[in-house]
């Protein structure tokens, strides 16, 4: 067992913010695609976007380039908290079980990934709610991050800021429990087999693989989570479209079909792919710094 290392926390946060800035417009189109077509919500009933590219072009044309970065402030704040805690906790937990990366197993990595994903996502949930609300509003957004934070708290209370926290934790458990172990195992296999060295090309291939695995595993939960977070629940007023996460899942499947659970898959993957590539390459380079 080794002492707590602060570097994974700092490097994880910096790499997460870098990756978020580079892929944010794709994440915004994913949110817009996922909230549209809800039969029980008049505001989002219309199918405005045919796909990711159409969404980007239409948002740019109708709302301006700035709208593609609606919610970037809470997104960066989220990565500064979520990304920092996620990577730091994951790496620290692994060192509790084994001292050397070569001794890590898939079971250990999955367990550490799931636990770190749940802890970090629960802490960072308010920033996730803010990001999704601001992304969905686009050019109609009123006030900045602080103003929207206060508005949610005043109208919906503390529950509003932690809306969808169970789904966020479930999604994080799936994403982190899949992505980080897949990256580690892929990288380890490529290096130990002699196919590739510990180079940027290995980091690229491993991060591409883990991004695809994460998107396939998490998209249904992501759709339900997005819709639950975007749903307003005014205190003392019963006007919710969905009674809970299971109800949201069943209504989405019943009203829109099974593949509605994979709405936004392409932007989800096209975001997770580049996001993970940028993140892991940045993270691996930061690890080489002699600090």
Swiss-Prot record:
Q: Which UniProt keywords apply?
A: Membrane, Mitochondrion, Mitochondrion inner membrane, Repeat, Transmembrane, Transmembrane helix, Transport
* Transmembrane stretches, start-end: 9-26, 71-89, 106-124, 164-183, 204-224, 264-283
The alphabetized list of GO BP terms reads: inorganic anion transport
Q: What is its main location?
A: mitochondrion
Recorded catalytic activity of this chain's protein: sulfite(in) + sulfate(out) = sulfite(out) + sulfate(in); thiosulfate(in) + sulfate(out) = thiosulfate(out) + sulfate(in); sulfate(out) + phosphate(in) = sulfate(in) + phosphate(out); oxalate(in) + sulfate(out) = oxalate(out) + sulfate(in)
Q: Which GO terms describe its cellular component?
A: mitochondrial inner membrane
Keyword Nucleotidyltransferase found: no
Question: Which molecular function GO terms apply here?
Answer: solute:inorganic anion antiporter activity
**Membrane topology per the record?**
Multi-pass membrane protein
Q: Where in the cell is it found?
A: Mitochondrion inner membrane
In terms of PANTHER family, this protein maps to: MITOCHONDRIAL DICARBOXYLATE CARRIER-RELATED
Family of the protein in this entry: Belongs to the mitochondrial carrier (TC 2.A.29) family.
Tell me what this protein is called.
Answer: Kidney mitochondrial carrier protein 1
Naturally occurring in which organism (per UniProt)? Xenopus tropicalis
